[in-house]
Amino acid sequence: LIRMHIVAHSDSKLDQDIKLKVRDHLVNWLSPQLAACSSAQECRLILEQKLDAIRDETCREIEACRGNYGASVMLGEFDFPVRTYGEITLPEGKYQALKVVLGDGKGSNWWCVLYPPLCVGKTAEADKDVRWFISSLFSELKKKAEAHE
């Protein structure tokens, strides 16, 4: 599982609008590049190779929206609260994520799941695949936890 987390520069209307424009741009830009990923490791490798390009794309979008700040882009393990995506709820915890911080990063944030893709256009079949993937993932985690008890 790999999440994407975008933190706005501030909570001003302009900065929140920029965050949403950056979100739309990155989701549209990354989707075709991650479409063929068959594992979280493969997705992570592609993201690692594209960190500079992701930052450049983010900064271009900020500038196009008349923002006067930069961005930092990191790939790592970050804390997330409980989050529901449609019928799927992810528990609180540490997750691999692409974190994009706009400017000072003091504004409200937005997140989604890049792999499996929960922040791209979805179909009923894709939703079923994602539910199966997450259900399988949590079953494996539960088995490992029970084995260590």
Q: How should these model regions be labeled?
A:
Residues 13-15, 82, 109, 121:
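Intrinsically disordered, low-complexity acidic/polar segments
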Residues 135, 146-149:
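Extended, compositionally biased alpha-helical segments that mediate assembly or anchoring
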Residues 88-141:
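Soluble extracytoplasmic domains of inner/organellar membrane proteins
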Residues 1-47:
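Early exported N-terminus immediately downstream of N-terminal targeting peptides
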Residues 41-101, 105-107:
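Mid-length scaffold segments of soluble, non-membrane domains
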Residues 9, 25-37, 53-65, 118-121, ...:
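Structured segments of extracytoplasmic/periplasmic soluble domains
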